[in-house]
């Protein structure tokens, strides 16, 4: 029988760290990563045949659950017509129309193949549109692995960026200003001093890469205000939150209109897709209409468009997001109550179909320093306890969890019963 330990050792001989994305290696929790053989509905199945209730959902895209039959049918039909053409298709226009209709802040949208491509291109576009170089990002927000965004935060209200990954030139990082997430005063201060030099703010409207941290009241509004006053471009990175926290994304949920939006994950229905779009006057700076260059061999891939279009059609059904949010609330509140009953300090954040678990005495977690102060060792033990119980959570204390339409209340209650047993041993 195949086992994950043997397969991981073999993978490490040919793939750096044995994985194609670092978080999958279980470095944040220890142990050997689970090698998955297949997935269906709310479950992933290891190579040993064990079923796990899955709250990773391929890191967000699988909002309908795995292997949804209607999505698979759409994909099969597209595959029968060919895998890639390198030419315009009806499907990519249909996707653009659908996305623009669901997100009114988008007058035009360009398809790419990953979230990193989307954020990288949006920043280049903002710089080209404004003629400015500096960008603002926030501690704990991840926007892909392009050089401008691999910059760590230091202390104080403003950090002139230092590279946090070898290979990022220091002079490039100096154009990235890093501020504390949810700190409106720091935003106003940096714009008072550098507003005329700043091309854009890029922000996860719900920070999903330091677990799940929603914006505090007034924070997103401040970003909109300072961009309006300075002429900077406001970019919402909705690669994770787009079509996940609400049908119109976090911008619809919170009622804030960005200038540009980046998308991914859900819009691909499990296939590699990204997108960026926004105001007409900005988007028309893109080649071939304008001078800001962006291109991609597989952008708008017809198979990926088929998966994404069917997914967007299904999640647009009435009450879909109301029901998803209620399921997430049921899980989040159930975990909090059971932890409290076991004497375990746990803060649970959730928005739409996202949730985050923080082992901390703090009543609310809204800042990066609070996230970093949480008990990571207790999370590690909780993760492995749940894995033994057949529940697959994100293998990192800094990643959000996801609920899908396939998670019915019986599945959620099985998860809560498992958590009750694990909490008792923590």
From Swiss-Prot:
Keyword Cytoplasm: yes
Cofactor(s) for this UniProt protein: pyridoxal 5'-phosphate
Keyword annotations of the record: Cytoplasm, Isomerase, Porphyrin biosynthesis, Pyridoxal phosphate
Swiss-Prot/TrEMBL GO biological process terms: protoporphyrinogen IX biosynthetic process
Keyword check for rRNA-binding: no
One Gene Ontology term, aspect cellular component: cytoplasm
One Gene Ontology MF term: transaminase activity
Catalytic activity: (S)-4-amino-5-oxopentanoate = 5-aminolevulinate
Cited SUPFAM superfamilies: PLP-dependent transferases
EC number: 5.4.3.8
Enzyme kind, highest EC tier: isomerase
UniProt cross-references to InterPro entries, sorted A to Z: 4pyrrol_synth_GluAld_NH2Trfase, Aminotrans_3, Aminotrans_3_PPA_site, PyrdxlP-dep_Trfase, PyrdxlP-dep_Trfase_major, PyrdxlP-dep_Trfase_small
Pfam families: Aminotran_3
Transmembrane regions listed in the UniProt entry: none
UniProt pathway annotation: Porphyrin-containing compound metabolism; protoporphyrin-IX biosynthesis; 5-aminolevulinate from L-glutamyl-tRNA(Glu): step 2/2
Localization (cell): Cytoplasm
Family recorded in the similarity comment: Belongs to the class-III pyridoxal-phosphate-dependent aminotransferase family. HemL subfamily.
Assembly and interaction partners: Homodimer.
Protein name: Glutamate-1-semialdehyde 2,1-aminomutase
